[in-house]
């Protein structure tokens, strides 16, 4: 197993992997592959943390990171970071690859001086990589009451003391909504991939 930086020659393979990993998981079909495709030209994209996982000679996993921010109570912006999509090919899920890729990428982020991470996810999985419910760190999720414990809004301090005295609200970076903002462009892009059936399944969020 090898983890390395994503290269331009990997782009299409990684986008197809992302599509396979997320298809019908959170909604009928998925948009994560388009988010990734568009994010590479986004100023918030962190190319040093766009990583692929190789097993048996093929790409089976990928993760990307983005700059983000917290809005403090006085209205100022405080640097934050997030990650995702993180994708593991369906044939390799539930075998520990996702956690290995995540932990590797977090270690790289820490080495780069990234102070903290915010994200939306399942605490039952992400606690194994050091995440906690963000409200315990004084962080709030946009659109929710400040005193609400939002169980899917998670955070982790990477630099000790980075969040000391900090209380703020996290807004998901706009780049993650590109498919909603440009639905026709998204549909045209998705049509370049093999046709798949969109299904409404239990547990989907959208």
PLM segments and residue spans:
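Acidic/histidine-enriched, glycine/proline-rich intrinsically disordered or flexible terminal extensions
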Residues: 160-206
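Conserved acetyl-CoA binding element of GNAT-fold acetyltransferases
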Residues: 75-90
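Internal, conserved structured core segments that host functional sites
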Residues: 49, 53, 84-87, 114, ...
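A short beta-loop-alpha structural element at the N-terminal edge
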Residues: 2-14
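Conserved active-site alpha-helix within GNAT-family acetyltransferase domains
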Residues: 111-114, 121-148
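Conserved acetyl-CoA pyrophosphate-binding loop and the N-cap/start of the following alpha-helix
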Residues: 91-92, 96-104, 114
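Active-site rim helix/loop that mediates acceptor-substrate recognition in acyltransferases
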Residues: 15, 22-70
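Short hydrophobic/aromatic beta-strand or adjacent loop that forms the aromatic wall/cage
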Residues: 48, 149-153
């Amino acid at each position: 197993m090898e983890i390395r930086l994503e290269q331009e020659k990997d782009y299409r393979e990684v986008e197809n992997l992302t599509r396979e990993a997320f298809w019908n998981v959170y909604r009928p079909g998925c948009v994560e592959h388009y988010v990734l495709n568009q994010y590479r030209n986004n100023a918030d994209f962190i190319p040093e943390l766009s990583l692929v996982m190789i097993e048996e000679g093929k790409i089976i996993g990928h993760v990307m990171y983005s700059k983000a921010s917290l809005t403090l109570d006085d209205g100022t912006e405080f640097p934050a970071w997030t990650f995702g999509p993180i994708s593991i090919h369906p044939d390799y899920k539930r075998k520990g690859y996702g956690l290995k890729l995540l932990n590797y990428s977090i270690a790289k982020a820490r080495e780069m001086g990234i102070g903290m991470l915010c994200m939306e996810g399942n605490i039952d999985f992400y606690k194994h990589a050091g995440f906690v419910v963000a409200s315990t760190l004084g962080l709030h999720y946009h659109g929710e009451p400040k005193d609400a414990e939002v169980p899917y809004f998670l955070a982790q301090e990477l630099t000790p003391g980075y969040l000391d005295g900090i209380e703020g609200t996290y807004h998901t970076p706009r780049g993650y909504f590109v498919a909603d903002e440009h639905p026709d462009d998204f549909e045209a892009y998705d049509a370049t991939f093999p046709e798949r059936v969109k299904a409404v399944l239990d547990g989907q969020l959208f």
